[in-house]
């Protein structure tokens, strides 16, 4: 059957117009779906980050890893740049509590002392024989022992980690335990000074759990707890500026110290006298908080800073 030549074209135009409308609607639905999915994942990620930090803030410090290398920037002590960028992208401000209260190594050297283990043994033994100190109530790993030597008794402090029940024993047992630690008899006041050169089996670094060797360099904190210099430096510059044993917070001493050291450069941290007999003096440009921090160190460690290391 032949098609008439004069057939109207309005039917084909209506079909073409309807097809174009369906294509536009389909494209609009796809665009809106993509936008909705993006907003959904954005909100989901933001909620996940929020609840993650909320749950982590509720956990104690003891449940966290000992030293976290991947979350902390060694130079600034803040969270890694990737985490900061993630917080900026998600529009979520990471709580300041999660930013580690750490310090720089230069600032740590201002309030603590480095001493070889063999010298620390000598100073501890001499302090146990002649001087008197008092126990800091904030430390749970210390015990006071009253030991008589001649007519004048002396009060000495020992640090016990492996045997926490040492303070509940009798006076004889405590004196015997102290004698074993110092490798000498408690009633012998004329023992040779060479006895302190024997390594103490109870002396070990609480961070790495390795025994101290004679050539090891220890860092003594103002709370009189000692650790390997490398271990405690890593702890306080990457994890938390507090003593791993007594949990005494030293970050408050470094809040203004870091600001002063940034103005006067690295030499500002070393312009403070490290001991009462040191010839180096405190520069006028350094903040007063440095002197207060040093006075805290000297008052908390009198028997160590009393002589040149």
Swiss-Prot record:
CDD domains: RING-H2_RNF11. Its main location: membrane. It is a single-pass membrane protein. The gene is mug145. SUPFAM superfamilies: RING/U-box. A zinc finger (RING-type) spans 205-247. This is RING finger protein mug145. Has a role in meiosis. It holds the Pfam family zf-RING_2.
